[in-house]
């Protein structure tokens, strides 16, 4: 089965078969990252523009590495060093970039829906590297790849996602992807950070407290508080948040013995995650980062029309 999409905007747009194809391709391409010479000519002659309107370490760096390992030319643009600071609109930026004939634009933007707007106005492929509180599809894919590598499947897994669900694009992509693949997602967080009706997104259960969500979980995914997306203070204090929604060894003990701990980063140690848990043997956080390169290689490969990798 080929990949039928020009763009990758949201995991809610992808079928189970398409998600499986991307994960299988990432698994195949991950071997390249273990070589002494980590480069193949697959996308030679292609140009990838990384257009980031928000700060990023892991996502931007891994998209750049992914492009270069496939031999594409990668160009990085940040809003602070572009004509955006001079008042240029997204539409004008897109038209000017398109005039330079890129093959793919990878964009992160603070406004939800910005990528759909962009994709309708450019002929090249668009990949969403995060838009507001909407979605972060590459993070969702790398999270699923990490889980699948550990458990050999996604169907039937109990995945607990804890924290600021309302403002988290990662939570939405994980929910869309995991429920499509047959996992059961359990959510817990402060009532002020839990969207009304989120159960309608799929096989999702909202729990009254964190311990209920973590109990017998295969995966415990911790999210940081998205202070930059909150218009007002939604918590009495960080200390109180950590008391009720921070993952420590005691709470982790409620999960299955072979459970893994995940976090999309950056971690706020001592708030949502104790250092002793972040650095424990059950932590898969650095595996997530490693898998991010392979997943983004797969995304670039398939929007360029690549066939399934054997």
Swiss-Prot record:
Q: Please give the Gene Ontology molecular function terms for this protein.
A: amino acid binding; aspartate carbamoyltransferase activity
In short, the EC number is: 2.1.3.2
One Pfam family from the record: OTCace
Supply the alphabetized keyword list.
Answer: Pyrimidine biosynthesis, Transferase
Q: Mind listing the GO biological process terms from this record?
A: 'de novo' pyrimidine nucleobase biosynthetic process; 'de novo' UMP biosynthetic process; amino acid metabolic process
Q: Which reaction does it catalyse?
A: carbamoyl phosphate + L-aspartate = N-carbamoyl-L-aspartate + phosphate + H(+)
**NCBIfam families listed in its UniProt record:** asp_carb_tr, PRK00856.1
Q: What name does the UniProt record give this protein? A: Aspartate carbamoyltransferase catalytic subunit
Organism of derivation: Citrifermentans bemidjiense (strain ATCC BAA-1014 / DSM 16622 / JCM 12645 / Bem) (Geobacter bemidjiensis)
Q: What is the lineage of its organism?
A: Bacteria, Pseudomonadati, Thermodesulfobacteriota, Desulfuromonadia, Geobacterales
């Amino acid at each position: 089965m080929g990949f039928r999409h020009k763009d990758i905007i949201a995991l809610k747009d992808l079928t189970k078969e398409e998600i499986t194809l991307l994960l299988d391709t990432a698994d195949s391409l991950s071997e390249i990252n273990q070589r002494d010479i980590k480069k193949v000519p697959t996308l030679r002659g292609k140009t990838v523009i990384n257009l980031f309107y928000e700060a990023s370490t892991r996502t931007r760096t891994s998209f750049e590495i992914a492009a270069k390992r496939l031999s594409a030319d990668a160009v990085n643009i940040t809003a602070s060093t572009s004509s955006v600071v001079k008042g240029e609109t997204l539409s004008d930026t897109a038209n000017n970039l398109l005039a330079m004939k890129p093959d793919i634009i990878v964009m992160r933007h603070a406004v939800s829906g910005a990528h759909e707007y962009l994709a309708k106005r450019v002929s090249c492929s668009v990949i969403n590297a995060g838009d507001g509180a909407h979605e972060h599809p590459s993070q969702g894919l790398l999270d699923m790849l990490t889980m699948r590598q550990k458990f050999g499947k996604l169907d039937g897994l109990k995945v607990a996602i804890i924290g600021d669900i309302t403002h988290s694009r990662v939570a939405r992509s994980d929910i869309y992807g995991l429920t499509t693949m047959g996992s059961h997602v359990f959510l817990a967080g402060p009532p002020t950070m839990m969207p009304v009706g989120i159960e309608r997104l799929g096989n999702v259960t909202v729990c009254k407290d964190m311990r209920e969500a973590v109990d017998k979980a295969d995966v415990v995914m911790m999210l940081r508080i998205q202070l930059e997306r909150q218009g007002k203070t939604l918590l009495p204090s960080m200390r109180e948040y950590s008391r009720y929604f921070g993952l420590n060894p005691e709470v982790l003990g409620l999960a299955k013995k072979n459970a893994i701990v995940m976090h999309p980063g950056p971690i706020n140690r001592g708030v949502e995650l104790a250092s002793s848990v972040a650095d424990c043997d059950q932590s898969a956080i650095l595996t997530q980062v490693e898998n991010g390169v392979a997943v983004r290689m797969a995304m670039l490969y398939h929007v360029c029309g690549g066939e399934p990798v054997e």
